[in-house]
Amino acid sequence: MTDTSASPPSAPSAPSAPSAAAAQAVVPAPKLTLHWGLFAAVAALLVVLAIPQPEGLTVAGQRMLAILAFAIVVWITEAVSYETSAIMITSLMAGLIGFAPTVNDPSVQYGTSKALGMALAGFSNTALALVAAALFISAAMTVTGLDRRIALVTLSAIGTSTRRILIGTIAVTIALSLVVPSATARSACVVPIMMGVIAAFGVDKKSNIAAGIMITVAQATSIWNVGIQTAAAQNLLTVGFMDKLLGERITWLQWLIAGAPWAIAMSVVLYFLVRLLLPAETDAIPGGKEAVQRELSALGPMSAPQKRLAAVSLGLLLFWATEGKLHSFDTATVTFVGLVILMMPRIGVMDWKTMQQRTPWGTLIVFGVGISLGTALLSTNAGQWLGQFVVTHSGLAAHGALLVFAILSAFLILIHLGFASATALTAALLPILIAVLQTLPGDINRVGMTMLLGFTVSFGFILPINAPQNMVCLGTETFNGRQFARIGIPVTIIGYAMMLLFAATYWRWLGWV
């Protein structure tokens, strides 16, 4: 590279050839504004730090609870992006825990190096590896267009009357939940297809038909986040916490057997609620079937990359479903092998550069720090202390497993109203709830109860802000928040009642309660 720092002044350049510095100057700097939520988060941090140290709580534990309070306020208020909050949490853990005495020997401090290692420990968790692989496979689906083909084939097979369109929308979300391990990616795939169908029908964007279709996309996506383990990041985070904190994990098939029946029942409930509360202006939509066939014909025959991706996806489903039955390969390992095949020269479907451009790396950062936060809460005894505090002052110990589940799941559903990310909610609260379960006496199945509480984390049905897929659908301007809540409130109430019914019967028969 030529060094120009000591060059003599040159003649003025022509106006048609502006200098690199001038070209750079025209790029406006990003405008950063302070959000009130950041001040509230810092205040929460300082308040918890200033409280006299409670009996039984370590110094490091109190500081971790202060960091947890900071994280919850930042995530609820969305004062900064989730990625920025993850870096903030990492720095706070390194600084505050680094100068705290260790749990085992209070005369020795953790040191910033060890504390930073605690803050980054989540990045070595197998759950993070699985999320990364899942995001890469989602990118492959988008690159090849296989997700779009699956959606159109499903709609074509079911039909395009208003009644069948709703059934088809739910069927599409179920099919994609099996092969696209990202709720946001699934909704982003289905939304343009359904908007094309709505446009082909010639119905108004503000009609009940359009609103019903788009709300169904969002709500069915959340419902099937419960049914399939690999359908959402928060599920994988839940499994990661099980493995790290309880020493056990739920297989893909075990999750499916437990969650899919509830999701099927709620899909039926959703269908009838949309039909009842957003009645379609007409039952017959001329040109609907032709519109779907036209879209499908435009895709042409199935391409070679689509066939290879379909084969790998089916292979992954087979291996996920037979883990512990026919083989001992865990879900993350199998998924990574599938990913290697998809990136192999000649037989793969995408290269690293393409995958890099289409992967939401911020999700992985938040996920890794979330696991670190939960693990550090327990390694500093903060989680155990808080769990004991909750059990002692709430009277949970006097109740049976069903009532404990009813109380804790209701708490998660209500607190979710303040969170825009189920992953953030899981990272903040699930380790504490696991600590509560560990503190409870009796023979409660703590792994099973953790899975069931993980189900309720996906209850983002009431407000559009409660889940990214809701916001994707809201962006179509086919419905407003009031219409969304009109469907979402009864879905939440019935879904919670169904959770309790399943906990008292089916899940108890399976041994999870």
Curated annotation (Swiss-Prot):
The lineage of its organism: Bacteria, Pseudomonadati, Pseudomonadota, Betaproteobacteria, Burkholderiales. Its main location: membrane. Belongs to the SLC13A/DASS transporter (TC 2.A.47) family. DIT1 subfamily. It is found in: Cell membrane. GO terms for cellular component: plasma membrane. One of its GO terms (biological process) is carboxylic acid transmembrane transport. It is a multi-pass membrane protein. Pfam families: Na_sulph_symp (PF00939). Signal peptide: none annotated. Keywords: Cell membrane, Membrane, Repeat, Transmembrane, Transmembrane helix. Residues 9-20 are annotated as: 4 X 3 AA tandem repeats of P-S-A. GO terms for molecular function: organic anion transmembrane transporter activity. The chain crosses the membrane at residues 32-52, 56-76, 79-99, 126-146, 165-185, 208-228, 254-274, 309-329, 332-352, 360-380, 400-420, 422-442, 447-467, 487-507. It comes from the Bacteria. Sequence repeats lie at residues 9-11, 12-14, 15-17, 18-20. This is Membrane protein.
